[in-house]
Swiss-Prot record:
GO terms for molecular function: ubiquitin protein ligase activity. This is Putative F-box/LRR-repeat protein At3g42770. CDD domains: F-box_AtFBL13-like. It comes from Arabidopsis thaliana (Mouse-ear cress). LRR repeats lie at residues 113-135, 279-305, 398-420.
Amino acid sequence: MNCLPDELLVQILSFLPTKEATSTSLLSKRWRTLFTLSPNLDFDNSLLLQSKKRKWNMRNIQKSFVGFVDSTLALQGGKGIKSFSLKFKETLGDVNGEVDVNRWICNALEHGVSELHLRIDYTKRCHLPSEIFTSTKLVKLSLVTQSCFPVVPNCISLPSLKVLFLDSIWFEVPQFLIFLTACPALEDLTIYQKPHSVGMPYHISSKTIKRLSVTYTCGYFVDYGLKLFNTPSVVDLYYSDYVRHKYPHMNLDSLPKATLDIHFLDDNAANVTELLSGIRNVKTLHLTSSTVKVILLCCKGEIPMFENLINLKFSGKTRQWKFLLPLLLEICPNLTTLVLSGLDQNWFVGFRTPPNNQVKMLSIMQYQGSERELKLISYFVLKMECLQVVKVYVSSPMNDLKKMQLTEDLLKLPKASPKLNIQVLVPSDTYLPALKVLFLDSVWFDFHQFANVFFPACPALEDFAIHIKSFRRKARSENELEHISHFSLKMEFLEVLKVYVALTMDDTKKVELTKELLKLPISSSKLIIQVM
C-alpha cells in the first residue's frame, strides 16, 4: 500500500469509518495526516459503547466519543466535507446529547456537506437544527430517529436536494407539504414508518419525484396518515402497507413500474379496489404473495383493466393464486412478459387460461423440479399459444446432475408451438451497470462465482483493487495464482494487473513469483502484469 499515491490512499480511507481511518495515522510519518484529507466523515458511537461498556462507565465513553468528533472536525480547518454520517445513541444521564449532535450537524453544514446521513436515538423528545432545512449544498439527506420532531422554518429552502430518506420522522401535516415544496430538484423519496411511529405525512405532493418508496409497518390505525399521492412524474413506485378501508388518492399519470406489498388484516371492511384503480396505467407490476391474497379477499369492486401492463411479476406462494392469475390475464390484454415464483408451494389442479392472452415470454423463478411445478409448466406451454420463450431459473444450490435431469424433463414437454424455446438458467440478481470503481479489503468470496457472475454484471468497471490478507503473508497461499488467473482470464478489457507482494518477501521469491505470473493465461495480448 505504501507504493500507492496519496490520492488513491485518501480515496481508500474515505470508504472507512472515521475511527478506523484515524487509526492509520500510527502507521508512519506519511500516514499521520492522510486521514484528514478524506472528504467523508463517518461517526458511530454504538460501536464504542459495545466494545468498552464493561471497562468504562457510559458517561466516560460518551465523553471520549464527543472529544473524538470535536477534534476530528477541528482538523478539517477550511476544507470542505462531502459526506457526513452520524450514528448516535444517547445514554441515560447524558444531558448534552442533543446539543453535541446539533453542533456537529451545523459544523458539517458550514463545511458545505452535500450528503448528510443521521441515525439518532434520543432518550427524550428532541428537535433537529433548523439549518438542515436551509442548506443550498445538500444533495442527499437521510434522517432516521425515534424521537426527533423537525421544526420546519418559514425560510426553508433545499434547492439542490435530490435524494431524501425519512425513517420514523414525524411532521405536522402542513410542514411536510411545505418541506416538499422547498425541494424543487427532489427525485428520490423514501418514507419508512415503524409501528411505534406517531404517524405519516398526510400528503405526498411533488412534480419532480421520479422514485417513490413508502413503507408503513403498523397494522393499527391503518387509515390514519396518507391521503394523497400527487406525484405525476414517478417512474418507480414501491408501496408497502396493511390493507386499508380507504386508500390515498393517486395522481400517477403514466407510471412505468410499481411494486405492491400489501399485508392482510382480519377486517371485512378493507378494500383495495381504489388502490388498484390508482395504478391502472402501470407498465411493469410486481405483486408479492401477500398482495395476491389481499386482492382476492379484499377487492370489493370490479378490478380495473390494466391496458398498459406489459410485464407482470406474480408470486404464487398462496393457494389463491390460481384464481387470480386467470383474471389478471383477462384484464391485461397487452401483457407480453409473465414472471412467476413460488409455484412449488401448492398442488396444481388446473385453471382456465384466456384464449386471447398475448404472453410471449414466461419466466419461472426458484424452480425445484417438483411434480406440481412440472405439471404447471406443461400446462402453460400447451395453452399459451403465443409463447415464444420460457425461461426456467433453477433454485440454488443444486448439483449439476440434478440440473441436467431437470433440463431433460422440461425439454420433453409437449408444446403448442414447435418454435417455443425452453431455457434452463442459473439465477443471478447481481447487476451493477454504473459501477466504475471497486475496492475490496479482506472480503472473502467464491472466486469462481466472483469471476463468472460478478464481473459480467459490472460492464462499466474501470478501476478494481483487491486487498486480501493471505497475500500479505510470507508463505504464499497455493490458491493465489489460481485466483489471479481468474481475473486475467475473465476481465477481457483488463489492461494492467498490479500484484503487490508482501514486504517480507525476499528478491529470490519475487523473481520466482514474477515468472509464474507472466506464465498465466490472459484474455488479451495487451494485458501488462506488474509485480510491485
